[in-house]
Amino acid sequence: MEMPTSDGSLSEGLISYLIRERGSAPQCAPEKHLSRLKQDVANTKMELKATLKEAQLASCSVELLLPLFKNTVEGISLENANLSASSLKKIFEQNDILSKELDTFNRVKLALEHLIKQTDYEQIGDSLLCLLKDLSDNESENRNLEEKVLEKETYIRELSCLFQNEKESALKANRLSQSVKVVHDRLQRQIQKREAENEKLKEHVQSLETQIAKWNLQVKMNKQEAVAIKEASRQKAVALKKASKVYRQRLRHFTGDIERLASQVRDQEAKLSETVSASSDWKSQFEKIAIEKTELEVQIETMKKQIANLLEDLRKMETHGKNSCEEILRKLHSLEDENEALNIENVKLKGTLDALKDEVASVENELVELQEVEKRQKTLVEGYRTQVQKLQEAAEMVKSRCKNLLHENNLIITNKNKKLEKMRGQVESNLKQVEQARSSFTSAEQRLQECQEKLQRCKEKCAEQALTIRELQGQVDGNQSLLTKLSLEEENHLIQLKCENLKEKLEQMDAENKELEKKLADQEECLKHSDLELKEKAAEYTALSRQLEAALEEGRQKVSEEVEKMSSRERALQIKILDLEAELRKKNEEQNQLVDKMNTKTQHQAICLKEIQHSLEKSETRNESIKNYLQFLQISYVTMFR
């Protein structure tokens, strides 16, 4: 039901589009032709409306008949009985009505197709005639415009040739001025680089001085700590000697008392033998002996208590010795940490040496760049000479000035070459000094490695001593039951021997520390010597930089004079170039206007063609949609009657 309305609106849209399209092109179609087209379009519109109304009526009747036909068929299928005469009549009547309506649909379809084809052919013919006229007119206009464009292009080419010739002369002058400016900028950059390198060297020297001061303070602190350790070890050794003497005296007293008691026991045993022989006197003397025995047992218990106290004192001394050994080990660990810090600082110094090497390499690269710049300057000078020979007829005064400038440049180049040779000699001497400093640093590193090995050996010795002390402690703990049987003098003698061995080892450590101090002092002297050499080199660099600045100032003055002369010429050339550019802009604007006109016409033609194609596509789609709709209706009727 919606198809006719949509077709009507689309036909109206096509009519309005054709009217607008033909109204927008008054040059192609006259007013009479437009009025005829309007009448034809109105007639076709009326015919299309009539056919569309017929199609609407047919579709409405079909819609009304289809549900009735469905109901009858469903009623017959539901009753499941034989068909009666009335039902057959109804079916035949509905079949006749549907066949009539299908015939009307076919007639409407044929009429619509015929009308659509007629309207399409008429529209396409009219549009083609108009387009052919437009194309002929546009071709004639395009030919005229192409002729004008060719004339303008020839004129523009002549102007561009003149402009390029003047541009080349201006570029030559600019190149001369730019080469002088480039040399000036490079010299300024080299001076700035040298100043930055000098500042870096000063900062590096200051950092080295601060590091040397820190090392001196650390060495002093290490010396003070070593002296304190020595004094503490001496005091501990004296205290151990005194304690050993006191223990020896006590042991002697105890041994004397034990011998006396043993003699007394022997005497009493002899007396007991006599009492056994004399049984008569046994009872009387037994009480006396029992009393004396109790007294002796009391004395033995007191002696045992004294021995236990002595053993506790020995244990305390052993613990004190252990603590002292642990303190010594801690101090050794601290010394090892300090040595590691010194190694780290040596690594940092190596890094600074590598940085100095890189700086020397950069200086060498700069020298190579300067040589390349000299070669380029020589090539430029040769090019300038050839240009001067070509321009001798036009500028004899300029030739004389250029010769003078070339002579001055050659003198400056020779002076620079001499200075560069001096700088090379100085750099080579500096490299030799750096290699000597490297060798001194390598020797110092070897010495430090030897010191580290010695410290490791001392650590191993201390560990062995700690193991021996632990073994002695285990022996003391295991042999507590045998202390009464063994002699304490031998143990004291062994302790004294161990104390003497420890003293000898401490003396060896003191000697090694003194050697390390001497090595550190030698390294400090080497560093001071290297600092003095660096200061001397910095002074030499400053003097050379001053000389270079003086030479550069002279060159700058000469360059400024040449730049002023070249600037006056450049201004005159720029004025001419601006005039030519203004003329070119005007001509380019005219050409652009012509091109825009051509483009607008071509775009208008393309738009018209696209719109016509679009309208044709729409009409084709409508025809296809109508055909599909009719086919759908036919298929639906066929399926229903089957």
Curated annotation (Swiss-Prot):
GO BP term, pick one: cell projection organization
Keyword match GTP-binding: no
Domain of life: Eukaryota
Compartments, record wording: Cytoplasm, Cytoskeleton, Microtubule organizing center, Centrosome; Cytoplasm, Cytoskeleton, Microtubule organizing center, Centrosome, Centriole; Cytoplasm, Cytoskeleton, Microtubule organizing center, Centrosome, Centriolar satellite; Cytoplasm, Cytoskeleton, Cilium basal body
Coiled-coil segments on the chain, per record: 31-58, 128-226, 254-603
Chief localisation class: cytoplasm
Keywords, comma-separated and alphabetical: Cell projection, Cilium biogenesis/degradation, Coiled coil, Cytoplasm, Cytoskeleton
InterPro entries, per the entry: Odf2-rel
A single Gene Ontology CC term: centriolar satellite
Its job: Acts as a suppressor of ciliogenesis, specifically, the initiation of ciliogenesis.
Family stated for the protein in its record: Belongs to the ODF2 family.
Protein name as annotated: Protein BCAP
Native species: Mus musculus (Mouse)
Gene: Odf2l
